[in-house]
Amino acid sequence: QLSQNQYSAFREHINYMIEADNHINLFEYTLHHVVRRHLDSAFSDENANVKSIRSLATVRVECNVLLSALVQAGHATESDRPTVFQAGIEELFTNADSAQYVSEVSLAKVDEALDVLVAVAPKIKRCIVKACVVCVVYDQYITVSEAELLRAVADSLGCPIPPIIASDNRL
């Protein structure tokens, strides 16, 4: 087991490796996020008093960001993205008309959204992951980027999914 100092050094080394080329790719983001989710709680009591969010409506903006990021990770054609996004939103909300596709989503924005969404009730988390899956499989083709981001999202929400094999073949 790591001491607090060893864990801090471990995190610093991971951050150094991730930032070495001044570009964070999706694999690096996923690694950082999974380590943060699983180990930070063991070395910090920061999340001990987090209240559960029980209304999906209160996290609509975060869901928009998350689904937009997944759509961008796997759908190269910009004209298709709003349609795929809408399919995911309709999985979550009965009134999906007010949902806004976010055309440019950074991994930092995804992190911010996940930091909020981690506090939603388990039933809502499952609904969010299901909407993410709808976006990923919409075109019956799963890219490596989509698979990695989906696994990071699901793991962050405490709803891990098995590894997905992305390929050049349609489902």
Where does each model-flagged region fall?
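Small-residue-enriched hydrophobic alpha-helices in membranes
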Residues: Q1-E19, H23, F27-L171
